[in-house]
């Protein structure tokens, strides 16, 4: 597995992202809060991380949910994955939603999401009158079964 140089700036005193295991694909992002807050069932909130990054051109960062928070508490990300473009320089924010049945307290320094880095290509659109045929055709949205 190779490495990607990513410049990072702490906007507040917050932990730097880190890989939790040797072969982890994503780094954990932590909440950077002046005070803990409660996320009620059905409620969503933009949670700051206190971090900004500079990605090399041709890369994106994907902000994804943490499986443990989803399984144990019903905490998910509204836009998953969230995309951080290579030219974005603002603070990374995580839009959490409580899909569980109980209030959930978000604490300062708590690991709330993970971030994965990926190459990305820009499309060059070629307008045509017809698209090539495939066995699947236009079948979608459950056409192969439940």
From Swiss-Prot:
Its cofactor is Mg(2+). This enzyme is involved in nucleotide metabolism: it produces dUMP, the immediate precursor of thymidine nucleotides and it decreases the intracellular concentration of dUTP so that uracil cannot be incorporated into DNA. One of its GO terms (molecular function) is dUTP diphosphatase activity. Keywords: Hydrolase, Magnesium, Metal-binding, Nucleotide metabolism. The keyword Hydrolase applies. HAMAP family: dUTPase_bact. Substrate binds at residues 66-68, 79, 83-85. This is Deoxyuridine 5'-triphosphate nucleotidohydrolase. It comes from Geobacter sp. (strain M21). It is an enzyme of class 3 (hydrolase). The lineage of its organism: Bacteria, Pseudomonadati, Thermodesulfobacteriota, Desulfuromonadia, Geobacterales. Its EC number is 3.6.1.23.
